[in-house]
Every structure is written in C-alpha cells, then in structure tokens.
Design a protein with these regions (language model features):
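Active-site glycine-rich loops that stabilize anionic/oxyanionic intermediates
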Residues: 25, 32-36, 108, 239-240
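Conserved acidic catalytic loop of the alpha/beta-hydrolase fold
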Residues: 84-100
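Alpha/beta-hydrolase-fold enzymes
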Residues: 105, 114-200
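Conserved alpha/beta-hydrolase "acid-adjacent" motif
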Residues: 242-252
C-alpha cells in the first residue's frame, strides 16, 4: 500500500496509510509505539477491515521509512507536534474520509500520545483502546533534568546510552532468563527476531526526543482535561509486560485517568503475554476482546 502524505501544523510531512472500506462502521486511528513503525500494524488493519472498520495508520516523527533522522522529532516542542500530528490525522479522517465515528488506538508510547491528545480533544473520539500502556512515574522530572544536562555536552541531536538505559534498561532486565535485550517485548521468538532484524525498529532516540518523551509522560499526570467526553476506554496488556508496571503502575494509570474525567474504563490483561500483545502467539485472544469492545454500547 502506498503512503499518503499530509502536512503537520509546521508544514512537516506526516506519512499515513489508509485502509479504507465501503460503508465502514467507523475508523480506527492507530498510533504506534516507540522505535517501531506503522507497517507492523498491517495485520491489525486487515483484521479491523474484516470487522467493518476503516483504519488509518501513521509513522510518528523520527520513525518509519520516510523520516529524515531516526529517533529525532523536532528542533523544539516535539512533544506538542506529536500531539498535533494526531489531531491533523483525525481531521483528515473527518474531512477527507468523511468518517466521524473514530476509535483512537495507541500502543505503548502511542498510548502516551493518545492520552495527551484526549486532554483537549476527547470529543473527537467515540472509543479509545490503550495497549501496553506506560504509566506516569515520579522520576520523570528528574529524567528530564538529566537529559537537559547531558544535552549541554552532546547537543540535542546527539544520542546517549545513559538515557537509553534509564528508559529501557528496566524493561530488558525484567526478563530474567533472556536470550536478547529485546525479549521483554514478546514471548514469541518469531516476533522478537522480526523486530531485531527490522532496520526501522530499535533505533535509539536522540536526547531531544527523550526530552519530548518525558514531557509527554508528565502530561499523563495533568490534573484536568478540557471539555471531557467520558467515552469508553479499553486498557489491554500482557500480564508479563514490564512497561505497564504491574498493579502499582496500572493503579497509577487508573488514578490519573479518573482525575482527568475518564472513568468509563474496562481492563483486560492476558496471561503469559508481554508487551506486544498483538504479536503474541495467542494474539487471537486479544483480537476477540477488541472485537467485543468495538461491538459493545458502553456509552
């Protein structure tokens, strides 16, 4: 499938793929995770098409085939541009595809962006699905300070193993008898190998991108949202996913969502699965829950 190019508010290109069908029930807008790309969601889009939904995927800035620099978002305010890009895509779905029933799907870092989008734009979406969702952590401000300090010596466009380890090291160590440092994403060796061998996956973030990521994480803890529409939200994760933070992390996520006005929540966790539940060997269980959620009238 060819890319469709649209422009962000700063005139930078956003590359999307449109999996459109006739007379769709709605459109699922997909926000992928950190250090991956939209083509890893082809199976998801195909399955959602069969359920009667159009799908629009996109590559985040600094990700995918068409980016100028892997792991780099923008010279400044990259966190805000990542949010506005998704609003631009939503406008495309509404105004070009003429679909107003939009379900927002975010995986991992994509779920962080999705939650930041909801703070001021919740009325644009009928339902939300958050997969492998990270939670707000009190150490985020310290991480942001550390990134700022490191950038004095390496510049914002440089990379830092210290920040790589601070952000991802805990996830890697969560799998005790790991064969690779990527084992935390999945129990499926095929999926792990596909990720490792994909040149568009696993590329380190620049220092400025880590700053933007930390600012987005801080946004998860915002006290209130604007003109909240309390739509149904499905939270899904593998029980062995270190990103969610087990019960403590999940409770923090629920607490923050509730405080922002979102309490129409449904949570499903899956035994013997890690971070990328859409790519696990038992992924059909996940798709069954998604299909059930899409078909429910939870409003």
């Amino acid at each position: 499938m060819d890319y469709t190019e649209i422009k962000g508010i700063d005139n930078e290109s956003i590359y999307i793929k449109v999996y459109n069908i006739e007379n769709p029930k709605g459109c699922i807008q997909v926000i992928h995770g950190m250090m991956e790309h939209q083509d890893r969601y082809v199976e998801f889009a195909t399955r959602m098409n069969k359920l009667g939904y159009s799908v629009v995927t996109s590559d985040l800035r600094g990700h995918g085939k068409n980016t100028k620099t892997q792991g780099y978002f923008a010279k400044k305010k990259g966190n805000l541009l990542l949010i506005s890009d998704q609003v631009t895509i939503t406008n495309f779905i509404q105004n070009v595809l003429n679909i107003n029933n939009i379900i927002l799907f975010g995986h991992s870092m994509g779920s962080i962006i999705a939650r930041n989008v909801l703070i001021n734009n919740s009325s644009s979406y009928s339902k939300v699905i958050l997969s492998g969702f990270p939670h707000y952590q009190k150490g985020t401000s310290a991480a942001l300070f550390l990134a700022g300090f490191i950038s004095i010596f390496k510049t914002n466009s440089g990379k830092s193993k210290i920040l790589d380890n601070a952000t991802l090291g805990g996830f890697q160590k969560a799998v005790k008898q790991r064969k690779t440092d990527t084992d935390w994403i999945s129990t499926s060796e095929e999926n792990i190998n596909n990720y490792i061998n994909d040149p568009l996956c696993g590329n380190s973030f620049t220092i400025s991108a880590y700053k933007d990521l930390y600012r987005l994480v801080k946004g998860l803890h915002n006290k209130k949202s604007t003109n909240v529409v309390n739509m149904p939200i499905l939270l899904i994760n593998g029980k062995d996913d270190p990103v969610v933070g087990q019960e403590k992390g999940y409770n923090q996520t629920i607490k923050d969502l509730n405080r922002q006005g979102f309490d129409n929540l449904k949570h499903v966790d899956f035994e013997n699965m890690r971070h990328e539940i859409l790519n696990e060997n038992e992924k059909d269980l996940v798709y069954t829950e998604i299909e059930k959620f899409l078909g429910e009238n939870l409003c």
